[in-house]
Amino acid sequence: MSLILEHVRVNYGRNNILADINAQLEPGQIVGLIGPNGTGKSTLIKSIAGVQAYSGTISWQNAPVNLRDIGFMPQNSRVEAELSVLETVLLGKHDRLGLRVGSAYIDAAAAILEDFRIGHLHDRCMTRLSGGQQQLVLLAQRLLREPKLLLLDEATSALDIRHQMQVFDRLNAYVARTGALVVIAIHDLNLASLFCDTILMLKDAHVFAYGRAQEVLTEGNVAAMYGVATRVTVEEGAKHVRLLKEG
């Protein structure tokens, strides 16, 4: 029941955006997709979602990925200007408004908004929200569907650190409850080390490193990826590493 990537390639003319990507991602975890800008993180997520042309094979639960059966939040997701927060979240269950929505779905949507500390905004128009608040609403929309595969491209980039940690706490709880697989492109290595079970590093269109966070987020790997010196510390009894820039 894994997400399997076999020899996945994406080319724009003569430029290799992704070159022979191979990985097997198991459900029941958060996978952090990291790497410098321009290494193909967004392209890989879009390829998995099936909205980007690629060569090779991508399968989920032994079948091609069906966008209608997964959760996909691309970078800079569009919001419907005239909809309220609650209406926007409910679109996660129905593709269009006007359909009869049961009270159970309304209650579930309201509960997710409360989890994200924005329940008080339920009747506010989406265009009156900050960028970070819009991201929270759009993530709530994806979670309402309860997908077994959730693909997130920089889904917390407009949030401050406190709200980012709240989102990851919510994602961890979601994974624990549903056994879903969450794949998220993320730049913050400290957040990746704290909340991601597995790390997939991309560099120069290839998989540079892949494995458990403790094994992959090393001083050598980070220095080779980003060209910066780091110190990696592991607190006694802690599950994850923390990355600190030297200086």
For each feature predicted by the language model, list its residue ranges.
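ABC ATPase nucleotide-binding domains
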Residues: A223-G247
